[in-house]
């Protein structure tokens, strides 16, 4: 377990704690947001601390003197901008952007923050303001009271980055929805829910059928009205369809909004939680039937207003509900089939022991009863291997000591005891679809699990044993690939379980062991080369003008590489000969040095040296020389890829740039150098 991290501010009365898919944490305070960035480098702290300031967004705020008295809100009258809620986007939206930090302020505006430093992540600045994408009249339409991101979903023939939905709840009773993907800008469609201020939003998981997917968006208003939108998207369209869906159960009306949260799916079932002061409702939704089937309810111990509700699960049949109150208490329940009960499991005891240990470790006062612990934020990590806990300790016995201690807050991870089931869930998710399971986040979760296990285990051995059934030889892979009738998309390279298994092993060797696994790297390169050549042959048969001169240069490298490395593999040679015949490429093809025009023989896939000694790096995908070309590099394994400006919108280079938009070798996201 990592050492506590002391945060830079006293927790405000507005509780928020959020964890990104790549392991970053954000904690909400008044005029700034504390951000913790995980570090895997040797001899460095576990987390690098940074702050996002809201000072630079004040000039965008409305002039209070221009507002009528009935249009004024409390946030308009405060002297400074205050963060009310923070949440991470499920992915970055462009190269050089990790998941964006979404901040909702007391002035009912929403901003995206990102780090401008790619190394230390110390400077976080505003990169987008959502009010510029919303209607400005009437004012209620652009006053935002709630924010939510859907999970990522990857559809056939779509970008490896996946797509997601971004929702804003407005004061007018509208929900603004936008589809977000790689290199996209927000374009909102507004839906009138016929209710008061929309103050709570929560997305369910996606239900994918063929090339379309659906999810539910649950909404609650300030006056307690509940609305549910069913949203459908398709890989053939840039827009989406919506329809209202009713809860088939009647609840006693309560004139205030509950907290909302959806669980992750378990055996094709997920739960929608509605949490009121003193009461919890859990609605069971069957994804295969597409409807709510039953609901459970339970009284809470605390009658305080809830400030957060989160879900987790430990194995194949139990879902947990974590409820945090404004008084700083945390209640945990288990959902099993048709029952709900206060959780009394090993994980509960771990939590209590963890908190009691912290109460004993802070200060030198002998009487532990005078120490007070408050939990300000509790957030399970994306893969549930641990939970982020934000807490503070106060000592009311001494006024002087109260001031000293109360101005400190801390963060730590609570490890999960169900490491085997969590590990299995993590591996399964990564094998099925690397697109919606970012490599950096998955590897960080495995690293956290490795650090918190009582019995030290060789994670590489665990990974190898778990993935052994998915690892196939290069020859078997080539044989299966050669029998494919039509290779229509390069994105399918990220949906192959064998490739994803190799990516996990290779990514772990680089991420934790700080060493390249040459065998895995070469095998991945062999498979990439053959797949691209087969894809090219498929595209040439449809469009003879598919290849530009630059595209042909890439294929010449592929042919040379195949002749050199795979000369004893008949299947690979057959494909290379077919490409060479159409391009009239000889087996002794050579390149020209960009500096002196001397001959460069193709002897290495990473480096190229001309006859006069000039050394050039090669693109890890195309193997072209990186002379004057712009390039980007993977944030996980540091592989370098050239940025091309293809002369045609539909050609091999354009497809490589668009469809291989995350690292082929480990699934990491690219940074622009």
Curated annotation (Swiss-Prot):
Pfam families in UniProt: TFIIIC_delta, zf-TFIIIC
Keyword Transcription regulation: yes
Any one Gene Ontology cellular component term annotated for this protein: transcription factor TFIIIC complex
Places the protein is found: Nucleus
Keywords: Nucleus, Transcription, Transcription regulation
SUPFAM superfamilies assigned to the protein according to its UniProt record, in alphabetical order: WD40 repeat-like (SSF50978)
GO molecular function, one term: RNA polymerase III general transcription initiation factor activity
Recorded superkingdom: Eukaryota
Gene Ontology biological process terms from the UniProt entry: transcription by RNA polymerase III; transcription initiation at RNA polymerase III promoter
Coiled coil (UniProt feature): none
Subunit relationships: May be a component of the TFIIIC complex.
Protein name: Putative transcription factor tau subunit sfc9
The organism of origin for this protein: Schizosaccharomyces pombe (strain 972 / ATCC 24843)
């Amino acid at each position: 377990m990592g050492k506590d991290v002391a945060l830079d501010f006293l927790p405000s009365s507005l509780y928020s704690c959020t964890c990104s898919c790549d392991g970053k944490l954000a904690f909400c305070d008044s005029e700034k947001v504390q951000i913790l960035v995980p570090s895997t480098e040797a001899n460095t702290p576990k987390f690098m601390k940074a702050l996002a300031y809201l000072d630079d967004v004040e000039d965008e705020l409305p002039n209070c003197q221009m507002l009528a008295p009935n249009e004024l809100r409390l946030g308009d009258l405060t002297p400074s901008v205050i963060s009310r809620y923070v949440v991470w986007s499920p992915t970055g939206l462009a190269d050089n952007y990790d998941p964006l930090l979404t901040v909702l302020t007391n002035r009912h505006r929403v901003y995206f923050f990102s780090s401008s430093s790619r190394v230390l992540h110390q400077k976080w600045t505003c990169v987008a303001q959502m009010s510029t994408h919303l209607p400005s009249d009437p004012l209620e339409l652009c006053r935002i009271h709630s924010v939510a991101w859907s999970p990522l979903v990857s559809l056939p023939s779509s970008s490896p980055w996946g797509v997601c939905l971004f929702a804003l709840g407005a004061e007018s009773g509208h929900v603004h929805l936008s589809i977000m993907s790689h290199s996209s800008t927000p374009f909102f469609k507004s839906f009138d829910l016929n209710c008061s201020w929309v103050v709570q939003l929560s997305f369910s998981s996606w239900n994918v059928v063929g090339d379309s997917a659906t999810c539910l968006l649950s909404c609650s208003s300030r006056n307690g009205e509940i609305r549910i939108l069913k949203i459908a998207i398709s890989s053939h369209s840039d827009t989406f369809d919506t329809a209202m869906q009713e809860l088939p159960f009647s609840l006693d009306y309560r004139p205030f909004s509950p907290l909302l949260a959806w669980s992750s799916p378990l055996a094709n079932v997920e739960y929608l939680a509605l949490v009121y002061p003193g009461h919890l409702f859990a609605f069971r939704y069957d994804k295969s039937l597409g409807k709510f089937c039953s609901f459970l309810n339970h009284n809470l111990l605390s009658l305080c207003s809830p400030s957060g509700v989160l879900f987790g699960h430990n194995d194949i049949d139990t879902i947990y509900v974590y409820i945090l109150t404004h008084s700083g208490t945390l209640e945990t329940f288990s959902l099993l089939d048709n029952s709900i009960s206060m959780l009394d499991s090993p994980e509960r005891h771990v939590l209590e022991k963890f908190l009691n240990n912290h109460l004993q470790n802070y200060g030198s006062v002998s009487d532990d009863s005078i120490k007070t612990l408050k939990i300000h934020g509790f957030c399970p990590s994306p893969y549930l291997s641990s939970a982020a806990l934000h807490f503070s300790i106060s000592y009311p016995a001494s006024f002087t000591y109260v001031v000293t201690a109360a101005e400190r807050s801390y963060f730590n991870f609570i490890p999960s005891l169900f490491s085997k089931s969590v590990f299995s869930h993590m591996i399964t998710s990564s094998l099925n679809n690397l697109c919606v399971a970012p490599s950096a986040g998955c590897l960080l979760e495995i690293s956290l699990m490795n650090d918190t296990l009582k019995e030290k285990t060789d994670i590489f051995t665990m990974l190898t044993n778990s993935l052994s059934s998915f690892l196939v030889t290069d020859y078997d892979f080539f044989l299966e690939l050669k029998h494919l009738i039509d290779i229509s998309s390069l994105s399918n390279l990220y949906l192959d379980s064998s490739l994803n298994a190799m990516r996990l092993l290779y990514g772990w060797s680089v991420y934790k062991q700080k060493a390249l696994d040459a065998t895995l790297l070469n095998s991945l390169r062999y498979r990439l080369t053959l797949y691209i050549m087969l894809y090219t042959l498929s595209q040439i048969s449809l469009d003879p003008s598919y290849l530009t001169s630059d595209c042909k240069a890439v294929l010449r490298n592929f042919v040379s590489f195949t002749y050199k490395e795979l000369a004893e593999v008949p299947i690979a040679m057959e494909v290379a000969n077919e490409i060479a015949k159409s391009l009239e490429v000889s087996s002794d093809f050579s390149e020209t040095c960009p500096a002196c025009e001397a001959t460069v023989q193709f002897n290495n896939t990473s480096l190229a040296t001309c006859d006069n000694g000039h050394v050039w790096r090669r693109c890890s995908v195309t193997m072209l020389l990186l002379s004057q070309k712009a390039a980007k590099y993977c944030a996980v394994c540091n592989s370098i890829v050239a940025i091309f400006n293809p002369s045609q919108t539909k050609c091999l280079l354009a497809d490589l740039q668009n469809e291989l938009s995350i690292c082929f070798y480990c699934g990491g996201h690219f940074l622009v150098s």
